[in-house]
Regions:
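A short hydrophobic alpha-helix cap/turn motif
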Residues: 3-7, 20, 46, 59
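Short, small/polar-rich loop/turn modules that mediate ligand/substrate recognition or access, typified
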Residues: 6, 11, 66-68
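Short, flexible catalytic-loop segment of classical short-chain dehydrogenase/reductase
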Residues: 16-27
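A short C-terminal helix-loop "cap" of Rossmann-like NAD(P)-dependent dehydrogenase/epimerase domains
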Residues: 26-40
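A conserved structural motif in NAD(P)-dependent oxidoreductases
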Residues: 40-51, 62
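Short C-terminal tail/terminal secondary-structure segment
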Residues: 56, 67-80
């Protein structure tokens, strides 16, 4: 899709959030939450604001040359 729509100045990118500290994770007990945190080289869960900032940037003119890309935002989880 990114290639098809690029000629129309429409950029298509993907964001892959990792474990984000949301009410959904609040249901986990502390031990499980610590196990999940330990899987992240950065040593913490992500914040929803961090995901929003990346999406905001990708949607802005500052990212006008970014197209067809995937952006994991997971504190290094996939690299681990």
């Amino acid at each position: 899709a990114a290639l098809e729509y690029a000629a129309h100045n429409i950029r298509i990118n993907a964001v892959g959030p990792g474990f984000i500290d949301t009410p959904l994770l609040k249901a986990l007990d502390d031990e499980m939450k610590q196990q999940i945190i330990s899987l992240h080289p950065i040593g913490r869960l992500g914040k929803s604001e961090e995901i929003a900032e990346l999406i905001l940037w990708l949607s802005s003119d500052k990212a006008s040359f970014v197209n067809g890309s995937y952006h994991p935002i997971d504190g290094g989880y996939l690299a681990n």
